[in-house]
Amino acid sequence: MTNESQPVSPINKLTEAKTIISFVVAVFVLYMLFSSIEFDTIVGVITQARISYILLATVIFFSTLPIRGERWRLLLKNIGVKAGLRDASEIFMLSWFANSIIPAKMGDVYRGYLARKTWGVPISKSFGTVYVERIYDVLTLVILMGVSSILVFGTNSPSEIRIAIALGFSIVVILISIIIAFSKGKMFVSNRLPIKVRQIFINFTEGLQESVKKGSISLIVFYTILIWIMETARLYLVVESLSPIHNMGISLSLIIFVALAASLLSAFPATPGGLGAVEFAIVGVFVLVGVDPGVSAGIAILDRAISYWGLMMVGGIVYVLSKKK
């Protein structure tokens, strides 16, 4: 958690050691992943993609932005912040961009900083809404991953898949446990903290508690499911852009599983935007079920051209033009 009065800039963090190291790690992972596959094969796959499908996948990806903005606006409303959809969506895009260039979801902290700058809400309190948002995302991801893995693998899921799902459920349990522990023991913990961080902790805890209001849960769940349906649709269109040429026969349930597994990795990344880890997951799962490595690599590159490099480009433009940064 950042100091409440400290300015936050994702661009300034680009030169920090942890950011540079995270990009080095990402490049190394990408090199290890793609170096074993013939470069000409990957290029051949990519150039055969139907551009209309890729463009539609791109439109769907960026169409999730106002939905994500509206979901966050509802969470902000729960803590007493009257935010407009346009402002919430713009700030979400700026934090999304920040997450693509700096590691460890620091863009979420940047979102809290922009919320304070725009609406006067403490960073730590608005960060509580981001934390709750993350729980909605991960819980939905893990449930849908579990269902899709059964459809793909039946009861004989590979150990790697079972571990991934178990890890996801563990993360959900930990996140929810923290909310319960902080809510039940707010005063007990805060009274034992240094005065400098006591109010930050109290604000964060209040943000957690107030974000979870029964009246908005059903709508937030609906938006969350809709977001992940659209994320899956993006990957489906990328796969379909190659399908007539390579006759892959990839089932919808497998596409759902891969899209969600990749999203889970990007939810808590050690590298900016999960760079390296997400590509590894996409290629790894497709190869695991018998898809050609070159085709799998092509799918990963095309999909990440939208969800990572496309986001970085569009987000960068928004960042340059935005008056909120």
Locations of the language-model features?
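Membrane-embedded alpha-helical segments of transport systems
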Residues: L94, A98-I102, F127-I150, I301-M313
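Helix-loop junctions and terminal segments of transmembrane helices
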Residues: R73-L76, V109-L114, F280, V318
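Transmembrane alpha-helix interface/packing and boundary motifs in multi-pass membrane proteins
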Residues: S95-P103, V258-E279
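Membrane-interface alpha-helices at helix entry/exit sites of multi-pass transporters
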Residues: L85-E90, G107-V109, V121-R134, D292-L302
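Predominantly cytoplasmic-facing regulatory/coupling regions of multi-pass membrane proteins
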Residues: M1-M93, L151, S157-A267, I306-K325
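Interfacial segments of multi-pass membrane proteins
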Residues: A115-P122, F280-G298
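Short intracellular "coupling" helices and adjacent cytoplasmic loop segments at the cytosolic face
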Residues: K82, M93-Y110, L208, P272
